[in-house]
Amino acid sequence: GELARKELATQGQFPRDFKYEVQEMSAPATYIAKLVNAKGPVYGISTACSSSGKALVSASTLLDNDLADVVIAGGVDSLTQLTLNGFQSLESISKNICQPFQRDRDGINIGEGAALFVMTKNTPITNNGVMLLGSGESSDAHHMSAPVPNGMGAQASMEKALKSAKLSCGDIDYINAHGTATVKNDEMEALAIN
């Protein structure tokens, strides 16, 4: 989309092969659905850093409520000038390696990536598979780009996930923190985890 907009600005028209519909947030989901001839709900989720996790929770909800037998869920993130400009305006991009929770932290490193999961209802754990044991969500609605300082939203999400999975804090061996290496996020996340 960004290159097409540049061509529009310089040439007065979009490239011949430009298709607006592939710029839509749901375009990757629509493409995959057509590729595998999927039936049922097809949509994209955009909730910033939580989008891929939210997609897995949404897939689990579809399965749990018998709205689907099999769901392809995951996430993709492309590095665009819009993304770079956004993080630069927040002054959160590090010029060094990302060091969450470290004293000399100075921000994140951003890149591209994608992952997809095929999820089915009540699939036992096998050597080649994993199971989503539980999930938890919250919204502290504190600020568009800053978490609530006391970490209560993140803590509520983790508590809901533990309850959903029928686990206790002592059952957890690893926490995959958001870990942005920004002062506000790291302080909040440390409080929530503690």
PLM segments and residue spans:
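Short glycine/threonine-rich loop-to-helix capping motif typified by GTGT followed
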Residues: M144-G151, T180-N194
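Conserved small-residue
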Residues: I32, S52, A59, F87, ...
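Beta-strand segments within the central parallel beta-sheet cores of soluble alpha/beta enzyme folds
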Residues: Y43-S46, V71-V76, G129-S135, G170-A177
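Condensing-enzyme catalytic core mediating Claisen C-C bond formation in acyl metabolism
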Residues: I97-A165, Y174
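Acidic, glycine-rich active-site loops and adjacent beta-strand->loop/helix elements
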Residues: T47-S51, G75-T80, G136-D140, G179-A181
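Conserved catalytic cysteine-centered active-site region
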Residues: G1-L8, D17-S58, T83-N109, A190-N194
